[in-house]
Amino acid sequence: MEVNKLILTVKEKIEKNVITQNVIVKDKTYLHKKHSSHQPGKFHLELIIKSEELSKYNKIQATKKIYEILDDEIKNYIHSIQILIG
């Protein structure tokens, strides 16, 4: 999957499954390209999610919910994901 399509898919899935005020998805793969663990076709993403719904959960519960929503993408296209919830 191409990174821009992945970003759009991630954003749409989060917005479909969680009540959000704002979702920003950033490609941070360029920061990791020289790492020995870098795999072509696997991306490093940063998610910034403004959600009163997720803010009601503790950090672990909110992160688990995002991981459940993005299960297929994490298994197939995402090497690393940073999640910031506000």
Task: Name each region found by the language model.
Residues 1-86:
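N-terminal, polar/charged subdomain of small-to-medium soluble alpha/beta proteins
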